[in-house]
Amino acid sequence: MHNHNNRLVITPGEPAGVGPDLAITLAQQDWPVELVVCADPALLLARASQLNLPLQLREYQADQPAIAQQAGSLTILPVKTAVNVVPGKLDVGNSHYVVETLAKACDGAISGEFAALVTGPVQKSIINDAGIPFIGHTEFFADRSHCQRVVMMLATEELRVALATTHLPLLAVPGAITQASLHEVITILDNDLKTKFGITQPQIYVCGLNPHAGEGGHMGHEEIDTIIPALNTLRQQGINLIGPLPADTLFQPKYLQHADAVLAMYHDQGLPVLKYQGFGRAVNITLGLPFIRTSVDHGTALELAATGTADVGSFITALNLAIKMINNSNE
């Protein structure tokens, strides 16, 4: 094992988007950890000069101890772009480059070289246009680290929302919620709240699937047939679960002040509340991986690339949360 405790790997994502800008902006302050950016050094230097920001790159040395990152510098794990990058213009020729940065960073996190992986935004459509099947970061990292199940969670300072199902059409959601799937998701959520967030007795509040959580079977049977039995089994294993509660009831201060996390049954049940409450400050976290992974909660913002107007807030929050999670894991 390396002295990895103070070493994070960052993937800026789509090279024509704001990811490189944000990595360079992050580098303008001191960090208590080493920031290793997996990207094309020429891309970062060109973008830094377009942004008129100072940037020194230091080649990553796996066998050297981690050093705290000084303002104006980044450590680079180099991957070359295939074609010239024009800010704001997607090019299918660089799709393999993007996937290679993710693979390299993921492998380093799996091996323990890096204590955490923080991802910038990718453009899923252009990766798929290159003939590379790509659903998203979460699925890519799960597949590469041989995880059968991972859990997507978004968090702000005040609220954490995990999802029982992620990127599915609404029509497919009820069929995807089974006692077995809930058992896996809640076990991972409970475990990671303890090990990565340092919460000894997590309180998890669970949404029902249907309006009014099924109204006792008058508005859908999923609560009675699936959700309630699954929660009862998990309670017998010592997991603190409250619910299922109607989602419109659950997202009120009197419940949320006691919740360490909320489990929503589908993407748009839980995330609109969180995004309204903390837009620009939300972080995406993948639970269940053998390493810490946080991410910005925004897209590639192609129109802002190289303009100097991209907001670095979500990236800073994602980095700070990763550092906090590293400290919790080391305790």
Swiss-Prot record:
Q: Which superkingdom? A: Bacteria
Question: What is catalysed by this protein?
Answer: 4-(phosphooxy)-L-threonine + NAD(+) = 3-amino-2-oxopropyl phosphate + CO2 + NADH
What keywords were assigned to this record?
Cobalt, Cytoplasm, Magnesium, Metal-binding, NAD, NADP, Oxidoreductase, Pyridoxine biosynthesis, Zinc
Q: What does the note accompanying the cofactor annotation read?
A: Binds 1 divalent metal cation per subunit. Can use ions such as Zn(2+), Mg(2+) or Co(2+).
- Cofactors required: Zn(2+); Mg(2+); Co(2+)
Keyword check for Secreted, yes or no.
no
Q: Does the keyword Magnesium apply?
A: yes
**Quick one: which residues bind substrate?**
H137, T138, K275, N284, R293
Which E.C. number(s) belong to this protein? 1.1.1.262
User: What is a single Pfam family found in this protein's UniProt entry?
Assistant: PdxA
Where it sits in the cell: the answer is: Cytoplasm
Q: Which GO terms describe its molecular function?
A: 4-hydroxythreonine-4-phosphate dehydrogenase activity; cobalt ion binding; magnesium ion binding; NAD binding; zinc ion binding
Q: Which GO terms describe its biological process?
A: pyridoxal phosphate biosynthetic process; pyridoxine biosynthetic process
The UniProt annotation places a divalent metal cation binding at H167, H212, H267
Q: Which InterPro entries match?
A: PdxA, PdxA_fam
Q: Which GO terms describe its cellular component?
A: cytoplasm
Which SUPFAM superfamilies has this protein been placed in? Isocitrate/Isopropylmalate dehydrogenase-like
Indicate the enzyme's highest-level EC class: oxidoreductase
Query: Which pathway is this protein engaged in?
Result: Cofactor biosynthesis; pyridoxine 5'-phosphate biosynthesis; pyridoxine 5'-phosphate from D-erythrose 4-phosphate: step 4/5
Q: Which NCBIfam families match?
A: pdxA
- Function of the protein: Catalyzes the NAD(P)-dependent oxidation of 4-(phosphooxy)-L-threonine (HTP) into 2-amino-3-oxo-4-(phosphooxy)butyric acid which spontaneously decarboxylates to form 3-amino-2-oxopropyl phosphate (AHAP).
Complex and partners: Homodimer.
Recorded family membership: Belongs to the PdxA family.
Protein name per its UniProtKB record: 4-hydroxythreonine-4-phosphate dehydrogenase
Q: Which organism is it from?
A: Yersinia pestis
